[in-house]
């Protein structure tokens, strides 16, 4: 069984000007969504003594930047969650991988009316190829963390 957690919301402005409802939404989707979906599948994976949880996180989970305080906090939270969960469930044959792409060529920023130069973004197909590689890895091999980005980013 494989779970791929791949949902996220972006928020970019100074903390004191952020709307509290928007902050809660970002935390709910980016961090609590990962935790709750993982929690839901672990009993099945434990029973099967096998499983793979892949969390599509972000390089924001190891970096920091002004005006991305909330977004980065959620992504750092996912990074810590992945590492701790991997330690917790390895004894049941469950693997956990933290995938941290750099800026990806998606329409997320356009939908939010944020101007971003996507020329140095990574194509989503490359991230998909990486995920397929992780899934195809033998069940006794874990890839705990991997970053992927455009060479010019």
Regions found by a protein language model. Give the residues of each.
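Active-site helix of classical SDR
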Residues: 38, 74
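Active-site-adjacent segment of SDR/Rossmann-fold oxidoreductases
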Residues: 63, 84-94
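C-terminal helical subdomain
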Residues: 94, 98, 116-153
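Active-site loop immediately N-terminal to the catalytic Tyr-X3-Lys motif
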Residues: 16, 63-69
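Substrate-binding pocket helix/loop in short-chain dehydrogenase/reductase
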Residues: 14-15, 19-27
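Conserved NAD(P)H cofactor-binding loop of Rossmann-fold oxidoreductase domains
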Residues: 7-11
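Residue(s) in the substrate-gating loop at a strand-loop-helix junction
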Residues: 58
